[in-house]
């Protein structure tokens, strides 16, 4: 996926989940943060960030904060990008894919994708990953009851005979592994273990991130601890 009208700035502060103050060409500017997660390890004062100018001139904020440099590594933190990346990546993940749809309801949940591959129906949920420590990535970065619920629903699907998958889209490149962040959310970690034991397919892919694009790159090992 690609972004239009990008520029770089320096992060100043984040007064709430939705906006950040940045220094752009010497001026302090308020921008929209396209991720309501904490991202405290990324958004530190002075960090270089990438902004994308919004297309609507009537918006309250002219820019979206989409990526941030953590050292030399550029991390995409747009919470809407993982689904777009996954849509581009699905034909590579499933070579026998024949069709898919997005945002499909099942039971009390809504899954990111439903499709057909090899003549069988499947459901797939996508999780975006931005938390990295020593080249290892973790999900989630904050407790997510919704995430654990999705895994339980995927487990039910798999047990009922329908193929179910979860895809972790790691919004950076050159990482060693992905694992559930048990310290932050033990319920999610347990749900992931149970899903895998039931036969749910668990995949992770890292991404080539540039200032104006994000593209799925290489499969990453998922560690179950």
Residue ranges, per PLM feature:
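Domain-level recognition of nuclease-like catalytic cores that cleave nucleotide substrates
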Residues: 171-225
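Beta-strand/loop nucleic-acid-binding surfaces
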Residues: 27-41
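A short acidic/basic microdomain associated with nuclease active sites
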Residues: 93-106
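Conserved catalytic cores of phosphodiester-cleaving nucleases, focusing on short active-site segments
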Residues: 9, 111-141, 154
């Amino acid at each position: 996926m690609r972004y239009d009208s990008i520029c770089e700035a320096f992060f100043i502060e984040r007064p709430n989940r939705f906006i950040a103050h940045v220094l752009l060409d010497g001026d302090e500017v308020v921008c929209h943060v396209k991720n309501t997660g904490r991202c405290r390890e990324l958004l530190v004062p002075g960090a270089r960030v990438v902004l994308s100018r919004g297309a609507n001139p009537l918006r309250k904020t002219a820019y979206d904060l989409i990526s941030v440099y953590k050292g030399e590594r550029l991390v995409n933190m747009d919470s809407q990008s993982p689904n777009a990346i996954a849509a581009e990546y699905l034909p590579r993940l499933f070579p026998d894919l024949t069709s898919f749809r997005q945002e499909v309801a099942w039971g009390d949940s809504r899954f990111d994708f439903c499709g057909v591959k090899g003549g069988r129906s499947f459901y797939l949920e996508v999780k975006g990953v931005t938390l990295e420590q020593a080249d290892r990535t973790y999900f989630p970065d904050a407790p997510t009851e919704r995430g654990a619920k999705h895994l339980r629903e995927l487990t039910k699907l798999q047990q009922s005979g329908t193929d179910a998958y979860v895809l972790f889209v790691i919004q950076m490149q050159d990482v060693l592994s992905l694992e559930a962040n048990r310290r932050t959310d033990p319920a999610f970690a347990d749900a992931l273990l149970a899903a895998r034991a039931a036969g749910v397919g668990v995949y992770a892919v890292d991404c080539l991130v540039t200032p104006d694009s994000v593209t799925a790159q290489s499969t990453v090992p998922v560690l179950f601890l």
